[in-house]
């Protein structure tokens, strides 16, 4: 994976439906919210990442991985119906469907809030996946509902109402690293990960990312690990140690 710019900001902010897998004291929760859109329908990009996640779950212990996928006319991952939305979990190289939600909106505050309330824990890592929109700070698109986008107000509204504090909030999306976005997530996370430019279509390398999330016992170690990984990336910019009032 190549990101032209990776922006890492370490912020010193102290920061259940039926059959939901609960995190043990030894597990780190990773929540991935996928607005799959045409990235999945046209090229199966979300499915490729799901396959990376499934493969990685074979070798990685200590992670509770929960994925929401929706907003696409077609889903290419085995066992999923087109134009449906799902909660999935991955463990020991297998994918389990936790919830088939049918055709529901994905780019709305209440949809993200439902996901966070059902599966979130304090100190979890949250990754938001989809198309980024630069200065407008919107994540999209929901191709099932008129290409709706998750706007900044809806995102921060869901984060605030969830009453969760995350270890990391990251965007596997283009152009989501901005002062405006940083200011919005400061109250909710210790670490912000995004790029200010375009991503390649394959986005993040989840085999690598999940291994680092599993093996980093502190935000400082996670930052150092990710900095080392991307140090040779073209035009990398890394910011750490910024203190929030």
How would you describe each model-predicted region?
Residues 70, 129-131:
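Beta-hairpin (beta-strand-turn-beta-strand) motif
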Residues 29-31, 64-66, 125-127, 167-170:
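A structural signal for isolated positions on well-ordered beta-strands in alpha/beta enzyme cores
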Residues 17-25:
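Sec-dependent signal peptide cleavage junction
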Residues 1-7:
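Bacterial N-terminal signal peptides that target proteins for export
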Residues 33-37, 131, 174:
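Short strand-loop junctions, especially beta-strand C-caps/beta-turns
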């Amino acid at each position: 994976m190549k990101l032209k710019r990776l922006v890492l900001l370490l912020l010193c902010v102290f920061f259940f439906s039926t059959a939901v897998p609960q995190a043990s004291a030894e597990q780190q929760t990773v929540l991935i919210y996928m607005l799959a859109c045409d990235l999945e329908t046209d090229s199966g990009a979300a499915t490729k990442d799901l396959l990376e996640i499934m493969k990685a779950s074979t070798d990685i212990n200590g992670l509770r991985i929960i994925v929401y996928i929706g907003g696409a006319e077609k889903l290419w991952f085995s066992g999923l119906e087109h134009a449906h939305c799902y909660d999935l979990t991955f463990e020991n190289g297998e994918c389990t469907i936790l919830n088939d939600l049918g055709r529901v909106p994905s780019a709305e505050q209440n949809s993200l809030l439902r996901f966070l309330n059902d599966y979130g824990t304090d100190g979890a890592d949250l990754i938001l996946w989809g198309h980024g929109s630069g200065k407008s700070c919107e994540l999209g698109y929901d191709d099932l509902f008129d290409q709706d986008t998750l706007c900044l107000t809806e995102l921060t509204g869901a984060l605030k109402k969830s009453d969760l504090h995350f270890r990391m909030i990251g965007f596997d999306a283009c152009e989501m690293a901005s002062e405006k976005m940083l200011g919005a997530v400061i109250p909710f996370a210790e670490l912000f990960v995004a790029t200010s430019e375009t991503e390649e279509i394959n986005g993040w390398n989840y085999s690598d990312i999940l291994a680092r999330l599993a093996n980093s016992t502190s935000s400082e170690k996670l930052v150092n690990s990710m900095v080392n990984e991307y140090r040779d990336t073209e035009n990398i910019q890394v910011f750490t140690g910024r203190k929030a009032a």
